Amino acid sequence: MDDSSINKELKQKLNFSYCEEESESEGQEAWETRDAHSQIPDRAEGQESEAKFTPPGPPLSSVHEVGTFQEKTKKSPEQVLMTPVSGFRNYPETPAQPDSRSKLLDCESPFTPKGLLSQSVISSTEKIPSRGSKHLRFTPVPFVDEMTSSALVNINPFTPESYRKQFLKSNGKRKTRGDFEEAGPGEGNVEQGLPAKRCVLQETNMASRYEKEFLEVEKIGVGEFGTVYKCIKRLDGCVYAIKRSTKPFAGLSNENLALHEVYAHAVLGHHPHVVRYYSAWAEDDHMIIQNEYCNGGSLQTAISENTKSGNHFQEPKLKDILLQISLGLKYIHSSGMVHLDIKPSNIFICHKMQSDSPVVPEEIENEADWFLSANVMYKIGDLGHVTSISKPKVEEGDSRFLANEILQEDYQHLPKADIFALGLTIAVAAGAESLPTNGAAWHHIREGKLPDIPQKLSEEFYNLLKNMIHPDPRERPSAAALARSRVLRPSLGKAEELQQQLNLEKFKTATLERELREAQQAWFSQEERGDAGVSGTPTGSRSTKRLVGGKSAKSSSFTWGKSSP
């Protein structure tokens, strides 16, 4: 019986129909190799007959056996044939069984068991690293997720440039990963890839924070962009003003507009003449801002009540309002921002709550802490139109208080636009009629003419208001100048006069001390010259004897006086 017939019968038993031609050739090569190494050719026929009835080998029990066997088959056919297998001890010269196993592992036959096929794919590849902590730590996929999530962080446009660069600068601690090392040069573009993202404003499926944390008391205001509610926080029991945007976020531009006020509040921080900001979040596609509650309402409400009763704010109160709002504007302008919507409805009043403990007199005598003792505080609120002085993106406010240069899109003197609006606000608080929104009367005011005020104001105060609405913004006083104006702070003028007198007295004292030192130096120098002249005379030897003798005489009088007769 030849080799080909034996090989065909073995293939029929294994039902190996997909790789017949390949198995024939390989089987024949294996027999030729085996015959070359055999030392007893006489037994070949008997062994061939026994190979006809060789049963299939036992199934592989583990992935380890498959991988081990495959590694052996990959070395060389000779090594595979010469390796003794425990399942073939009775048939040491049977080549078909290991060859069939290699076919099961290497050929994707329709009759190949799926388990063996999948195991062969695994074993044919390189060693898979363990999914331990080290593998997870250095895989780039989670790091890509971190970079993606960091792109969802909003960049506050009002943050100072130096602080923003420091904030965006990487500290290099995460640069152990290869992908991040390659992406290192693009770190400077982080800011460009961090716009206001819509997902930053969206809440996940969770209970309403507004309903969970706050108890709504009443509605206290309605504006163009939102409604304000008086609420009590359930946790601390304090009262807050919660502002909810009227319109939902329909697009990215509306989101930026809604975030504008949050950005401004966050950068400004806390100031006694700016409404305090606590937190903000998005809920049901609406922006919600938690602010300080001002128990006195708005200045517009107070003006309306005065108009109904026929009263007006008197000049001392008007000066107080102007001074406090000027201090708030000074702080905003010094932070590199402008409000651009100063008007009575955006100025809020806080009445000081009476304390059970008496106020220590020393605490209110300091001029620098005068606002701590004020019974009424005036604060600037509604920062929805705030923009940067250096990079303005102007959103026009109320046209009744709008400066002409803003209408002409001249943004070179933006802080002076707030001064213009503040001057008209004080005029309205003084009793002026409702301001025009357009027309000849509107332009009449922009020419530097105050509206009619029913009460008599002092000349200096009236002129100050006129300067605040001067047609040329450069001629208007700054917020810092208003804060130190003697018209608004007479006591500050007296203090300055006293300070000047003190400085003059200090100068006089310093002059006298200098003259005294010069006189002392002249006297000492004269004494030194006198001593030098006496020691330099021609009869120096005689004078020396006399001086010595004189000294000796004096000493003898003290020493020998008692013993002399």
Swiss-Prot record:
Write out the catalytic residues in the record.
Answer: D341
Sequence motif Nuclear localization signal, residues: 173-175
SMART domains cross-referenced by the UniProt entry: S_TKc
Protein kinase domain location is 214-492
Q: Where is the composition biased (Polar residues)?
A: 553-565
Keyword Oxidoreductase listed: no
Coiled coil residues, start to end:
495-521
Which subcellular locations apply to this protein? Nucleus
- Enumerate composition-biased segments (Basic and acidic residues): 31-51
Q: Name one Pfam family in it.
A: Pkinase
Q: How is it modified after translation?
A: Phosphorylation leads to increase its activity.
**EC number from the UniProt entry:** 2.7.10.2
The primary site where this protein sits is nucleus
Q: Where is this motif: Nuclear export signal?
A: 317-331
Reactions it catalyzes = L-tyrosyl-[protein] + ATP = O-phospho-L-tyrosyl-[protein] + ADP + H(+)
Q: Which InterPro entries match?
A: CC_SR_Kinase, Kinase-like_dom_sf, Prot_kinase_dom, Protein_kinase_ATP_BS, Ser/Thr_kinase_AS, Wee1-like_protein_kinase
Top enzyme class: transferase
Give the Gene Ontology MF terms in alphabetical order: ATP binding; magnesium ion binding; non-membrane spanning protein tyrosine kinase activity
Free-text function comment from the UniProt entry: Oocyte-specific protein tyrosine kinase that phosphorylates and inhibits CDK1 and acts as a key regulator of meiosis during both prophase I and metaphase II. Required to maintain meiotic arrest in oocytes during the germinal vesicle (GV) stage, a long period of quiescence at dictyate prophase I, by phosphorylating CDK1 at 'Tyr-15', leading to inhibit CDK1 activity and prevent meiotic reentry. Also required for metaphase II exit during egg activation by phosphorylating CDK1 at 'Tyr-15', to ensure exit from meiosis in oocytes and promote pronuclear formation.
Instruction: Please identify the protein, giving its name as recorded.
Output: Wee1-like protein kinase 2
The uppermost taxa in this organism's lineage are: Eukaryota, Metazoa, Chordata, Craniata, Vertebrata
